[in-house]
């Protein structure tokens, strides 16, 4: 089913007070005969099931998610359930050794959401040294350094490729399979950085 038509129909169902449901592909054993997954929406095929589920919940107003294949990993099921119950996104990433204390912490999102970055609400730290000031690729996790003055210590996630900025230290990267989650973060979302297995 096409994405735009699917969203339109779901909003009509919601207007009638009906629950909406959709399938996402499994991540371990795919169904015969194509072994490509069995999602409701073609757009979800090839996506990590957790990312596909978040997209369906956020963009198409889906109430219930089903796995369209024989098997799914417990980790992915936990991520989906936790997002549905708590509005918290688990984002797998790699953080530089110095910043690994950021793993498994819950962060809120600032209410003023720019188009190009996600700004986390966390205490700012003055005097952060200038290091790893690199081009900021989509999915980069950055911390503002002392050149950012009062914003020193602020943590952001880059939503689209941005040029080098001397006041931004790249401290980690979102795993490529999870980068599309950045499109669905709003001011109500909370996130947790998870270490890659």
Regions found by a protein language model. Give the residues of each.
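Catalytic alpha/beta core domains of metabolic enzymes, predominantly
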Residues: 1-96
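C-terminal functional modules
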Residues: 94-197
């Amino acid at each position: 089913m096409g994405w735009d038509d699917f969203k339109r129909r779901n909003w009509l169902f919601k207007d009638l007070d009906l629950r909406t449901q959709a399938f996402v592909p499994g991540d371990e054993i795919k169904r015969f005969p194509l072994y490509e997954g069995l999602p409701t929406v073609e757009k979800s095929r090839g996506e990590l099931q957790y990312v596909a589920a978040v997209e369906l919940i956020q963009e198409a107003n889906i109430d219930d998610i089903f796995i369209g294949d024989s098997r799914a990993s417990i980790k992915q099921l936990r991520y989906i359930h936790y997002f549905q119950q708590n509005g918290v996104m688990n984002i797998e990433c790699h953080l530089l050794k110095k910043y690994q204390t950021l793993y498994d912490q819950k962060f809120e999102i600032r209410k003023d959401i720019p188009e190009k970055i996600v700004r986390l609400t966390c205490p700012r730290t003055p005097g952060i040294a200038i290091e790893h000031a690199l081009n900021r690729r989509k999915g980069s996790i950055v911390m503002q350094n002392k050149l950012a003055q009062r914003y020193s210590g602020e943590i952001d996630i880059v939503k689209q490729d941005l040029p080098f900025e001397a006041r931004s230290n790249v401290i980690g990267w979102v795993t490529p399979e999870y980068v599309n989650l950045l499109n669905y973060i709003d001011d109500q979302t909370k996130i947790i950085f998870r270490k890659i297995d």
